[in-house]
């Protein structure tokens, strides 16, 4: 009896361990095994999060860009293209965020595939750095109200694909829309209390966030995450930090903090993470991190930086 019990417990534990090894943001999902669910391929984490929030248990999501990877310069593999051949919906941000998307979509032979560009219909911020190949800033989701618009685009697509579950998708959208407006109010109430409005960031990813709440981003590097600041730009930022009593230099987890650390060392400022939510680490997702929690983390570090 004891041996039988031990064997049963061993099987249960093994099952739990195996399930714990499965990617929680869909990098390892096998779309062929998800019978009855809408099969979604999401380009990177933020698109996964939107699809998950609206689709819930009615969808199976495969995320293309691996966990913790910077999506700007990632390139798809032949396996990713095969996944698109099996998918019902391909969700990508657009606006230049995934420069590889148009190239691979032209090679896909999947007549049922619905292609959804989440930034479609949104007024984009023009990229002021003329030496970069990006026409616009693609980081629209950092304005919560634009994130809501992206969720609505996905909701409408899922309703069209799967009208029998219309009420389910609309309910999920309403619930997350309420969370968006609560978050938006928290940002407005908090930021309005500070006279200081300038933030120094390593990467010009926060234009939509700043426009939404009256902030001004001073970017060391351009919208392209792999751009390099010139010595002149470094000197200009260093002077600005000193002249304006900037206490924090923001950097991103997926990009080297070397430049931010250099300026912080020269000016006496501190460094802190401001997350553009392009690609969360697997560990963070397993610990409950998602769009709303990370945006609140961002608000807390912004409040520290804006104090006089």
Predicted regions and their residues:
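N-terminal secretory signal peptides that target proteins for export/translocation
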Residues: 1-3
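Extracytoplasmic metal-acquisition and chelation regions
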Residues: 5, 10, 20-308
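Residue-level signal for mature regions of secreted extracellular proteins and peptides
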Residues: 14-15
């Amino acid at each position: 009896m004891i041996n039988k019990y031990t064997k049963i417990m061993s099987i249960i534990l093994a099952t739990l361990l195996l399930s714990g090894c499965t990617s929680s943001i869909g990098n390892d999902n096998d779309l062929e095994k998800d019978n009855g669910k809408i099969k979604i391929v999401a380009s990177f984490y933020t698109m996964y999060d939107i699809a998950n929030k609206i689709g819930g248990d009615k969808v199976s999501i495969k995320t293309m860009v691996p966990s913790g990877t910077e999506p700007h310069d990632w390139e798809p593999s032949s396996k990713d293209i095969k996944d698109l051949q099996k998918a019902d919906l391909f969700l990508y941000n657009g606006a230049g965020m995934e420069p590889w998307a148009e190239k691979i979509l032209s090679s896909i032979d999947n007549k049922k595939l619905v292609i959804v560009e989440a930034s479609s219909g949104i007024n984009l911020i023009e990229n002021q750095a003329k030496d970069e190949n990006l026409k616009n800033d693609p980081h629209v989701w950092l304005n919560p109200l634009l994130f809501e618009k992206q969720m609505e685009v996905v909701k409408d697509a899922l309703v069209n694909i799967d009208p029998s579950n219309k009420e389910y998708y609309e309910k999920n959208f309403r619930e997350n829309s309420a969370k968006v407006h609560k978050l938006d109010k928290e940002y407005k109430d908090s930021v309005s209390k500070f006279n200081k409005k300038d933030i120094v960031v390593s990467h010009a990813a926060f234009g939509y966030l700043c426009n939404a709440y009256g902030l001004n981003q001073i970017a060391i590097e351009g919208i392209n995450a792999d751009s390099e600041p010139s010595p002149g730009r470094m000197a200009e930022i260093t002077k600005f930090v000193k002249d304006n009593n900037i206490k924090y230099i923001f950097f991103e987890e997926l990009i080297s903090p070397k430049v931010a650390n250099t300026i912080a060392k020269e000016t006496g400022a501190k460094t802190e993470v401001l997350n553009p939510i392009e690609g969360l680490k697997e560990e963070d997702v397993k610990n409950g991190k998602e769009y709303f929690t990370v945006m609140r983390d961002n608000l807390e570090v912004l409040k520290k930086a804006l104090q006089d």
